Amino acid sequence: MATLLPGVSFDNGGCHAPARALIDAGAALALATNFNPRHTPTLSMQAVIALACLRMGLTAAEAISAATINGAHALGCADRVGSLEPGKSADLLLLDVSDYREIARQFGVNLVRLTMKRGKLIYKAGEVARRPRPELRRE
């Protein structure tokens, strides 16, 4: 599994991994943010997906697969996360787009309207779900 870091191109003079050639040769790709203090720190997977499409030649469907199920395979946890299937953790985002291909065209815009982790709502349209405070034990 080739894991590509589209955000690094901002730090290395615009060079990119040959993503299209790798896919055309039959390789499976994963996408990652490469968040670290030394090289272009990027937290946004939306930005990574957009860069993969705009600069590396991936289609929106290829980039989304590389960021989700293929990323889970690269991390060795595809049996638990990476796709919506019975028995897997329901980690998902609801994005404000009418067509999935818009994700790659709206660079720099936060499209997230809802976030769920393990089936529980943690973010909804501008508000963060409150976590119950743990009870303090009296000793």
Where would I find each of the regions flagged by the language model?
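Active-site core of metal-dependent hydrolases
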Residues: 1-14, 122-123
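Short, well-ordered turn and helix-capping elements at secondary-structure junctions
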Residues: 6-8, 35, 99-101
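His/Asp/Glu-enriched, well-ordered alpha-helical/loop segment
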Residues: 13-97
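C-terminal cap of metal-dependent C-N hydrolases
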Residues: 67, 89-133
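Intrinsic disorder/low-complexity segments
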Residues: 134-139
